[in-house]
């Protein structure tokens, strides 16, 4: 067998060596994108859940089979979805307890009695009166363990609040009168200590009398509270004496006024007021007389005398009649003025209107 020569050894060394094996792949992190996207495949299978507890034992084998089928379906859903449905039941949710009595009121019950379930009702006076007593009674009535027939019957409504019905049936005038009576009783109680108990009782009967009086007091009542002026009636002898004194003196001194009041059995204030009124009347009379005189003088100044003139064609008519042979009457002027006529108005001064022909 021939030995390999040096050329064969050189060719063997010139051949490339095989590549080294690749390094092992790094261990995948559980937080890699692939694991996050396909996390359901690496999740361990869920543990079998015990069957749900039932409040009542199944009555028959069919009920037991139905419960087993429901448990199997629940396990299948948990395996497919990747989470346990029982964990949802362990979450704590807030409980909302709504009393059923607020939603169980029949419709006709609310329609027949709007006064007890609504704390503010319209009164005939036009204002809103709070009804705390009515609302409290309504709550007590709702909370009481009454049967359905008692709740639906309208008889408790008719007997519930007779006081409120009486208050609603009264007119605003009656309410105002009652309040004014209570205010008067309060004033009497303050004035007389012996009647303090009665006034306190009347005030307690109407606690909102003061507030009502502020709102219901009308402007028509205010003028009635003013003191009416008294009118003094003088006798004929007193008027005659006062008139004679006024003719002599328009103004009296304090001593003269005191003496006249003593002689006529009057007060000085009455005499003073009579003289003031008499002077005002006298001034009005003077003003009226002066105005009448001015009007008469102005009317007299405006009068203008207008003479009646003859017609200008009287001469032509006379000539025509003479040509016809008829006797011609001599026409005379209707009015003749020996002196020229002047205006009596002061603006027009000495303007002659007509001179004799």
UniProtKB/Swiss-Prot annotation:
Superkingdom: Eukaryota
Biased composition (Basic and acidic residues): 130-140, 149-173, 210-223
Keywords assigned by UniProt, alphabetized: Developmental protein, Differentiation, DNA-binding, Homeobox, Neurogenesis, Nucleus, Phosphoprotein, Transcription, Transcription regulation
Low complexity composition bias: residue spans: 191-209
InterPro entries according to UniProt: HD, HD_metazoa, HMX_Homeobox_TF, Homeobox_CS, Homeodomain-like_sf
Amino acid composition bias (Pro residues), ranges on this chain: 16-27
The keyword Transcription is assigned to this record: yes
Pfam families reported for this sequence: Homeodomain
GO terms of molecular function: DNA-binding transcription factor activity, RNA polymerase II-specific; RNA polymerase II transcription regulatory region sequence-specific DNA binding
Stored SUPFAM superfamilies: Homeodomain-like
Main location as per UniProt: nucleus
Positions carrying Phosphoserine: 153, 180
Start-end of DNA-binding region: 227-286
GO cellular component: chromatin; nucleus
Family matches, as PANTHER family: HOMEOBOX PROTEIN HMX, HOMEOBOX PROTEIN HMX3
Similarity remark: Belongs to the HMX homeobox family.
Function: Transcription factor involved in specification of neuronal cell types and which is required for inner ear and hypothalamus development. Binds to the 5'-CAAGTG-3' core sequence. Controls semicircular canal formation in the inner ear. Also required for hypothalamic/pituitary axis of the CNS.
Protein name (database record): Homeobox protein HMX3
Gene: HMX3
């Amino acid at each position: 067998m021939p030995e390999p020569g040096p050329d064969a050894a050189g060719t063997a060394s010139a051949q490339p060596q095989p590549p080294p094996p690749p390094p092992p792949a790094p261990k995948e992190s559980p937080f890699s994108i692939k694991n996050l996207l396909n996390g359901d495949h690496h999740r361990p299978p869920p543990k079998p859940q015990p069957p749900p507890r039932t409040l009542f034992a199944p009555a028959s084998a069919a009920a037991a089979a139905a419960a087993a089928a429901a448990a199997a379906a629940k396990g299948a859903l948990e395996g497919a979805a990747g989470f346990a449905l029982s964990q949802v039941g362990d979450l704590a949710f807030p409980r909302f307890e709504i009393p059923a009595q607020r939603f169980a009121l029949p419709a006709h019950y609310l329609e027949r009695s709007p006064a007890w379930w609504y704390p503010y009702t319209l009164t005939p006076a036009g204002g809103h009166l709070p009804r705390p007593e009515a609302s409290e009674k309504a709550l007590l009535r709702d909370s009481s363990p009454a049967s359905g027939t008692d709740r639906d019957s309208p008889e408790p409504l008719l007997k519930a609040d007779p006081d409120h019905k009486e208050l609603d049936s009264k007119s605003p005038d009656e309410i105002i009168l009652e309040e004014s009576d209570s205010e008067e009783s309060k004033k009497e109680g303050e004035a007389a200590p012996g009647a303090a108990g009665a006034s306190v009782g009347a005030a307690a009967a109407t606690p909102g009398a003061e507030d009502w009086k502020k709102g219901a007091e009308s402007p028509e009542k205010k003028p009635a509270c003013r003191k009416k002026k008294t009118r003094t009636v003088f006798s004929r002898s007193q008027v005659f004496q006062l008139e004679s004194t006024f003719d002599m003196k328009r103004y009296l001194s304090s001593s003269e006024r005191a003496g006249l009041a003593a002689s006529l059995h009057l007060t000085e204030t009455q005499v003073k007021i009579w003289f003031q009124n008499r002077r005002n009347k006298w001034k009005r009379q003077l003003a009226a007389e002066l105005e009448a005189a001015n009007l008469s003088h102005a009317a007299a100044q405006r009068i203008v005398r207008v003479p009646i003139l003859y017609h200008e064609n009287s001469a032509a008519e006379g000539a025509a009649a003479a040509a016809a042979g008829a006797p011609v009457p001599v026409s005379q002027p209707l009015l003749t003025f020996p002196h020229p006529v002047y205006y009596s108005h002061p603006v027009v001064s000495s303007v002659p209107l007509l001179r004799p022909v």
